[in-house]
Amino acid sequence: MVDDRQGQRGGRRPRPSGGWSGPGRARPAQPQQPDGRHTPEPGPPIPPGVDARQLAPEIRGELSTLDRATADAVARHLVAAGELLDEDPEAALSHARAARARSSRIAAIREAVGIAAYYCGDWAQALAELRAARRMGSKSNLLALIADCERGLGRPERAIELARGPEAARLEGDDADELRIVAAGARADLGQLEQALTVLSTPQLDPARTGSTAARLFYAYADTLLALGRNDEALQWFLHSAAADVEGVTDAEDRVSELG
């Protein structure tokens, strides 16, 4: 079955088999200061070389409501989370949670937890955190991630509904293409491969494009063609995906070798 979620073949990761840390998991009592205020856990150690000043200026601006020591700790955990996201998403999630423990009312922090949870395949936590970030005014486009979380939770119909909504209609460029990939995957989840192919090819694909989003879009199109038994066309689009994949986010070259 075609699957665009973070999977091994398309450059995104598979869903973990268990051990999710969703909102229903019991939490230990939190330490408090003598005056009753919550004292956050120290969190994981900050990797060497991480500096709060590495945080994007717009996110540093969101931390301006915090005292200096707290803002510095949060910033360093967020930088660490970003640096670890691809190589060790579980560690990235630990750092993002450490930032959230110090301030849970800042959109960028909740977004960081949501994205790290998404990379870990913890769809329930990712969905809750990404929705919270949106409520708090996140300026990032999170619709494709939210729709993909719905897929991960076994609700492809909900992902399709989001992809048809007014917010989706306003998307352009890579943001629109990311949502196309998710919507096509949701169609494939339902066994609707022809509809998935239509989603991916509307508007018409441009094989001359490059970049990670184009590479994944072409890859998803090729994978859908392959699932439909159209192997020659699939090979051609895996070739386009490999050519577009300047950052190495897919295994398109391996698929070409398999089909060639």
Explain the meaning of each model-derived region.
Residues 1-64, 70:
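Basic Arg/Gly/Lys-rich low-complexity intrinsically disordered segments
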Residues 136-139, 168-169, 198-205, 231-250, ...:
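TPR/TPR-like (Sel1-like) alpha-helical repeat modules
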Residues 65-101, 112, 118:
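Alpha-helical segment of the N-proximal tetratricopeptide repeat
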Residues 80, 112-113, 146, 183, ...:
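Structural register within alpha-helical repeat arrays
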